Every structure is written in structure tokens, then in C-alpha cells.
Amino acid sequence: MDAATAPKQAWPPWPPLLFLLLLPGGSGGSCPAVCDCTSQPQAVLCGHRQLEAVPGGLPLDTELLDLSGNRLWGLQQGMLSRLSLLQELDLSYNQLSTLEPGAFHGLQSLLTLRLQGNRLRIMGPGVFSGLSALTLLDLRLNQIVLFLDGAFGELGSLQKLEVGDNHLVFVAPGAFAGLAKLSTLTLERCNLSTVPGLALARLPALVALRLRELDIGRLPAGALRGLGQLKELEIHLWPSLEALDPGSLVGLNLSSLAITRCNLSSVPFQALYHLSFLRVLDLSQNPISAIPARRLSPLVRLQELRLSGACLTSIAAHAFHGLTAFHLLDVADNALQTLEETAFPSPDKLVTLRLSGNPLTCDCRLLWLLRLRRHLDFGMSPPACAGPHHVQGKSLKEFSDILPPGHFTCKPALIRKSGPRWVIAEEGGHAVFSCSGDGDPAPTVSWMRPHGAWLGRAGRVRVLEDGTLEIRSVQLRDRGAYVCVVSNVAGNDSLRTWLEVIQVEPPNGTLSDPNITVPGIPGPFFLDSRGVAMVLAVGFLPFLTSVTLCFGLIALWSKGKGRVKHHMTFDFVAPRPSGDKNSGGNRVTAKLF
């Protein structure tokens, strides 16, 4: 058989990736055929190339390696150890399920490692050994269930850790041990049921903590104790969080606090009192209905308050009392009908005011906004009037400096309807005083006691929602003059009403209430002054008769004994002195009483 007719050797087709892996690499070597390379910086871009293994022949001076969006399933020990100058490695959106200990050995210059969008399940010790210079680690969108003790112990330079969108249910107390420089930690969209306080306490340099979209219903007292350097805390989308424990933020020295899209029904004043360095407070999208007066005053350095998208219906006068540095308020998209100037300690210092999306009534209470409208930053949507009807829908910036008659005016409060001026009630009975008024804006109704104290909405003597004064179980001390005061921002009016209490005399000489009885048990019986005199007379006469009779019998017995002797003589024998042989009888006479 000649060479021309001899059968050719059939070589099996080699996979192209195998050739890539066999290509030699050296300093400044050629770029792998399946990748794109740049020189400034020294980057090898192999993303979204359907790769199932790391290509060979990577230049040794590579500073950025992008392997994202491929089909890599694992990293073996030492696979990238020759890339000692590598600073950024992107392995995101592959199929990595395991990382062998030492997989990143030799990457002592690596600063950024992106592993999001893989299938990693457990982070154990030794996985990140050799990454002594790493500053950013992104583990989002994996299937991580738990962090074991020492999982990040080799990352002494790590500053930012992202671990959101995992199945995380447990963080061991020592999981973050060794992260001495970690400054930013984000835990979001996990299955944690409690805040891992013991693990967080191992982060002495933590500055920013973000806890987002967690099904945690309580932040217990001391949960974040030990984070003395923490400045920014964000709690976002905890639908089960209805309140903060008073000691939940103890030990923190925050400058920014955001608790948004939770279920807080009121501002957590008790938990905030000690945060004297707080500058930014964001409570947006919580069902908070009011900001009361003077409750924020302990936050002396507060500059910004955001409470947009809540349920605010009122901001009280002096609500921001004591906040001398306050300059930004965002209360957009609420149910506020007004915002009075007296809420602010210095309205002229206000720089930014977000007030759009509120049903504002444009009356005299908003004149101060007209005065400052050219200097205030209202954002993209300036506030607009929802009433009265002749200005409805008109933006505050559309009004001229000279207002037409009837614009932005108020009507003083006047009492229009009241009950009788003199009310008589029996002791133990029920008394009601009615009082209401007219005005624009609608006035509030208050009542004052006879001794000058204002009455509240609870107790035996209380003011009802419609302004009616109710006194239950009337007592003698309730008598006197009660003053009804109706007031609004334009003025006030008052009316005095008297209450006279009739003391109820108990029947049959008793002071007890005959209507209050217990079946089968006789009630207490009390005597009046006449009854007491009769009892004393009945008891004293028999006693006096008995004493007189006794003395009479004694006198008769004494008379029957004859003449009364007043002296008596007694004979006695005295001791005889020695030598005295002539001793006669001795006698002594005693006087009888």
C-alpha cells in the first residue's frame, strides 16, 4: 500500500476549551481567543461567553478579570494563583455551588470579588484564605443558608460586605470574627427571624448597617449593643415591626436613622431620646398620624426629618421646638390640611419643604408659606390648595404678592350653641354640659375645672369628642364654675357654666345609699344626732339609778351598826431591854378613817 492510498490517522476532535487551557501564559501574554482584552487597565473580559471553565493563557499582569454570565460550576484550589496582580474578579451569575478552601490562594492583590447570582449554600472557614487585601465582597443572590464561625476570618481588610437575597436562616456568633475593618454591611431579603446581635457585636469598625426586607417583628433592647462606631442604620420593609423597644438603640451614636415601610403607628420617641447626635431621621411610609408638640426636642442636632407617604393628619404647634439646626422637612403625600408657622422654632431657617400631595386648606394659617415661597425649595411639585373652592388646585407659587380680598383669611371662633348656664345634679348622679362653636378654621373645644385645671378626654370628668363635658358619679367637690373655651388660630370665645350638687339625705337615718344593696346581706345602719341622744339617754338612766341605790344601801347598813368610832386603842408587847425587870403594859391609840 503506498502512501497515497494509505488510510489517514483519524484524530479525535479536541474541544476548543482544552486548547485554551493548554495555551502557555507568561507576563504580558496574549489575550485568550474567547476574551477581549484592554491595556488601560490590564483587563481580560470573558463575560457571557458560555464558558464552562476558566480560560488558560491569561496574562500574568491582568488587573481585572470578568468571567460573569458563564457556566462555571466550581473553583479548584490554586486555579488563579498565578494572577498575583489581579485586583478585581467578577464571577457573578455563573453556576458556582462550591468553593474549595484555597480557591483564591495567591490573589494577594485582589480588592473586589463579585460572587452574586450563583448557587453557593454554605460559607465555611478557609474559603477566602489568601485574600488579605480584599475590601469588597458581594454574595447576593445565592442560596446561602448559614454562615459558620470563622467564615470570613481571613478577610482582615474587608470594608464592604453584601449578603442579600439568600436563604440565610442563621449567622453563627463568630461568623464575622476577624472583620476588623468592615465598615458597611447589608443584610436583605433573607429568612432571618431575629437580628444576629452576637455576630454583629464582632464588628468594631462598622459604620453603616442596612437591614432590608426582613420578616422580623421586634428589635429587642440591646440588639445592636457594641456597635459604638455605627453612624448609619437603615431598617426597611419590616412589615411586622409595629414599635421599637425603648432600649433597642441603646449604645448607638447614630447620625442617620431610617425606619421606612414598616408598621410604626407613632414616632418612637422613647427609643430616640438618647440620640443627641442624630442629624437625619427618615420614618417615611409608616402609618404615623401625628407629630405632637416638643417630643423631638432631645434630638438637638436634628437637621432633616422625612415622613412622606405616611398617614399624617396633624403637626402640632411647637412640634420641632428646640431643633435650632432644623432645615429640611419632607411630609409629602400625607393627609395634612395645614402646617402652621408655630411648628418651627425658626421658620426663616427652613430651606427645603416637601408638602405636595396634601389636601391643604389655604387660609390664614398658610400666609407664612406665601411669604417664604420664593426662598423655599418645594421640589418638583410645589404644594397646591385643596380648598376653599375659589383657589382649589392653585399652586402656592401662582399667587401674587398682593392677595385679592377673601384669600387666605380666617374667621374667629364663636360659641354658637351651649346648654343651660346653671345645672343642678344630685350627688351620685350624672351631669352633662354641651358647648360648640363656629369659625374658620373649625375651632377646638376645651373645658376648664373650677380650680383652673384643663380637663382631658379620660376619667370620671372628661371631655367627649364633640366637645361635651360629662361628669359621672357627681360628688360634692364637683360643684363650681366650669369654663368652655372654643378657639382657633384667629381667636377664641368662652362661656362659664355653674354646677350645683344637691346632697342626698339617706332615708331612715342612714347615710348609706339605699339603692346600693347586696341581696341577703343587710346594709350598714347609721344614726343621726337625735338617735344618738336617745341611745345615750336609755343607757345613762339605768346606770344612774343603780349607783344611787347602791349608795343608799351602804348608808342604811352603816346606820344599823351604831355610833361611829373615830379612835381605837391597841395593846402590844414591846421588846424588853436587858436589865429592865419592871416593864408595864404598852398601849397605842390610832385614828380611824
Swiss-Prot record:
Q: Which residues are glycosylated?
A: N191, N253, N263, N492, N508, N515
| Signal peptide feature range | 1-28
Q: Domain of life, per the record? A: Eukaryota
Which SMART domains does UniProt cross-reference here?
IG (SM00409), IGc2 (SM00408), LRR_TYP (SM00369), LRRCT (SM00082), LRRNT (SM00013)
Keywords in alphabetical order: Disulfide bond, Glycoprotein, Immunoglobulin domain, Leucine-rich repeat, Membrane, Repeat, Signal, Transmembrane, Transmembrane helix
Ig-like C2-type domain location is 412-502
Where is it located? Membrane
What does UniProt give as GO cellular component?
extracellular matrix; extracellular space; membrane
Report domain LRRNT positions: 29-60
The question of whether Repeat is a record keyword is answered with yes
User: Do you know which PANTHER family this protein is assigned to?
Assistant: KEKKON 5, ISOFORM A (PTHR45842:SF12), SYNAPTIC ADHESION-LIKE MOLECULE SALM (PTHR45842)
By what name is this protein known? Leucine-rich repeat and immunoglobulin-like domain-containing nogo receptor-interacting protein 4
Q: Which species is this UniProt entry from?
A: Homo sapiens
Name of the coding gene: LINGO4
